[in-house]
């Protein structure tokens, strides 16, 4: 009898262990799949492109990419479009944030290579920018990523952002600070929709799919950069719809 109970215990334990292992591995596999999906970087988010942003968001929402989409804001575009003066646009950004979109920082006015400057100028612009964000109801402490305009920035500006625990995203790498050391991480950051004409959309789709698969194979994060207005031209949105559909299947 004792032997029977012991065998029964082993069977029950084995079933429990295998079930747990299956669901644990399934969960890890699902998490790994999600981590491999593209991260969408939306540059130049400002009231100037309100209509265009809505068109982009419609496609992102269609494939449930909200949590992997990052909105890089220009807080005072061309020194004419201060976020404080556009409450409807700000409310829309808050709505997107609640839905999972990430609010990040791109520029103060986006004039020239504005953060390719000395420490004093960089600090002044960043402080002004964060003040505007606060006045619009955003929490600057939640800003984790920065894309410099035209991917240009000085060493002084780099130190400033890293000192505030903000990771810098460039064309082929991310720069961050870990345990007091500056770390550079290789990434794939591509833009296929810069005023993409209709005849080239299929070519862009094939190139993007190849780049994405190669990035996964080489264990690099894949970033899809898009600019409002540029992506809304020609077949840009058609490409975006295709690419998110393909990558959402993983």
UniProtKB/Swiss-Prot annotation:
Question: What membrane topology does this protein have?
Answer: Single-pass membrane protein
Where in or outside the cell? Membrane
**What does UniProt give as GO cellular component?**
membrane
What biological processes does GO assign it? carbohydrate metabolic process
Q: Answer yes or no on keyword Transmembrane helix.
A: yes
UniProt keyword list: Membrane, Transmembrane, Transmembrane helix
Task: Give TM segment ranges.
Answer: 4-24
Q: What name does the UniProt record give this protein?
A: Uncharacterized protein MJ0505
Give the species this sequence originates from.
Methanocaldococcus jannaschii (strain ATCC 43067 / DSM 2661 / JAL-1 / JCM 10045 / NBRC 100440) (Methanococcus jannaschii)
């Amino acid at each position: 009898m004792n032997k029977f109970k012991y065998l029964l215990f082993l069977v029950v334990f084995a079933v429990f262990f295998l079930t747990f292992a299956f669901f644990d591995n399934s969960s890890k596999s699902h998490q790994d799949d999600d981590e491999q999906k593209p991260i969408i970087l939306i540059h130049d988010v400002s009231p100037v492109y309100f209509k265009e942003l809505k068109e982009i968001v419609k496609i992102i929402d269609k494939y449930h990419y909200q949590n992997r989409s990052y909105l890089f804001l220009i807080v005072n575009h061309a020194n004419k479009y201060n976020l404080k003066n556009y409450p409807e646009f700000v409310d829309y950004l808050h709505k997107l944030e609640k839905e999972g979109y990430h609010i990040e920082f791109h520029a103060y006015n986006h004039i020239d290579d504005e953060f390719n400057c000395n420490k004093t100028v960089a600090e002044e612009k960043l402080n002004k920018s964060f003040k505007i964000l606060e006045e619009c109801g955003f929490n600057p402490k939640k800003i984790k990523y920065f894309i410099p305009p035209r991917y240009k920035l000085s060493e002084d500006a780099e130190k400033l952002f890293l000192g505030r625990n903000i990771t810098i995203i460039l064309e082929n790498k991310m720069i961050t600070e870990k345990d007091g050391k500056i770390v550079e991480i290789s990434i794939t950051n591509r833009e296929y929709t810069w005023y993409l004409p209709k005849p080239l959309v299929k070519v862009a789709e094939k190139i993007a799919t190849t780049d994405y698969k190669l990035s996964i194979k080489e264990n690099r994060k894949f970033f899809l950069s898009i600019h409002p207005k540029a992506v809304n031209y020609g077949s840009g949105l058609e490409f975006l719809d295709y690419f998110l559909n393909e990558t959402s299947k993983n």
